[in-house]
Amino acid sequence: MRKPAVLALVLTTILLGSALAAGQGQPESPLLKSWERYVQLKESSEFRLEWVSIGPVLNSARAACVQGDPSRPGTLYAAFGPGNLWKTTDNGLTWKPIFENQSSLGIGDVALAPSRPETIWLGTGVDLKKPRNFTMTGTGVFRSDDGGTTWRNLGLHDSYHIGKIEVHPTNPDIAFVAVHGHYWTTNPNRGLYRTLDGGLTWEHVLYVDERTGANDVVIAPANPSVVYATTWENYPGVSGPSSGVWKSEDGGTTWHRLGGGLPDGPKTGRIGVAVSASDPEKCYVLVDNLNRDETRAAEVYRTTNGGTTWTRTHTADLFIFPRIGWYFADIYLNPRDDEEVYALGVRIAHSRDGGRTFGLLGGDVFHLFPNPAETLHLDHCELWIDPGNPDHLAVGNDGGVYTTFNRGKTWLHHNNIPVGEFYDISVDNQDPYMIYGGTQDDASVFGPAREWNPRYADAWRYVWIDAWSGGDGCYTFADPEDPNTVYFSSQNGAARRKDLRAGRSVSIMPRLPKGFKGRAEYNFVTPYFISPHNHLTLYHAGNFVFKSPDRGDSWKLISPDLARSSDPDR
């Protein structure tokens, strides 16, 4: 008869210990200590170099977050994955960086307090797990109470990657933070955190395991006691059985996992969630359901009874993120009409009938500064819907910030923000020299080392741009003896040589010899360069290394398969 009492005592002790530990937040990150050391060294150095922006602005970079201030028309915030939070107060004609000199440049999410929009919550650390390349980590949560003029770090330093911040609709000091955690290791600090005192203390209110982070969280505006959240098993891969949808009915203190028709297989991926502004029982999720054909993984489900049962809203497949749902899975509802749904992926899927049918947003695109792109850029990261005017949208994607005042019939591209995520840069031998670089999904560009004047377009130009207004530029460099000959590459080993005078390029990607047994494999960003000893000689490498003596017109295989062990028994 004493065993149940003993068991209850043990469980109570475990739970109490967890609550105490959660209240203490997280341990300090070594990244923050490194930043503090850097600040000390910089302040004591006699060589404090001042940096100036030289561009480019014609292409922009991946805008991870966009948020508007409904109380101040014309005020918009845009956060970029590779760096900084920018603010405009004139509908995007001019922008100012407002997150300078902080311990992290990479940003995962930004949220304005609905009841006090000058209070801004910011989560650092890029919120997407790129299996193929570097992802910038963060140093916790920051808060500003003056519209971004000053900032305080509020802890959660060991989060590394923050997926979402949600602020209470009437209390700016209550917020939830969805923490992805460390992408490349197990980590006990994954999960959902809550603060009730403006970030002074934190509670770890939803935790699954050290492989599963929290991805998204929404508070029902009509009843803030109702909170929905999603978890994402993001280590070691990008899917798992612990990915799911959760609900709290007491403001986030206790949680239960929802089922009733939702995908729950071993390959459930990233999940986004949106709740009706008027009905806390009506909720939508966008699921990267890798349990089915990966090209058809994007699925929208809806509940009208608070999560007891769910139904897939559409019969036709969406095809908005084939095989790369780890990049997307964000879903939004019109605050005035919960039958109007936006699902983000490579394209924006739009429904006005509760998700039963979807079309793709496109429309004509105009640029603030000259740009040859004619279409809306791909790969959409966040959408803001003006609650006072649902025709007014702002979207952040791999091409930057776009706004529309007619629900996507026409778009304005705000390519007047000097940001870019460069894989690599190089310079030629001219005097003055030109700079070349390949960017993350914003093509290959070149331009002068000249300080940019925000009132004017810069002098940068494209070496190459794909048909969808972007493309990963990777390595870009000029022939050291002929600056009119430029070499550039794009994802997965593609390589080209361009004659700038003629404006023409040719593919020079190497191929394995005919009849050769084996298969060439390439990293997303493939090593590719000119020999420092002979400007005609090129090298290109994947699991095989190739050498060209004639600018890429021909190639010779100079290595075995480097992905295979030289020991036949291994």
Predicted regions and their residues:
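Bacterial Sec-dependent signal peptides at the C-terminal "C-region" and cleavage site
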Residues: 16-26
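Beta-propeller blade termini and top-face loops
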Residues: 24-570
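Bacterial N-terminal signal peptides that target proteins for export
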Residues: 1-9
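Bacterial N-terminal signal peptides
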Residues: 8-18
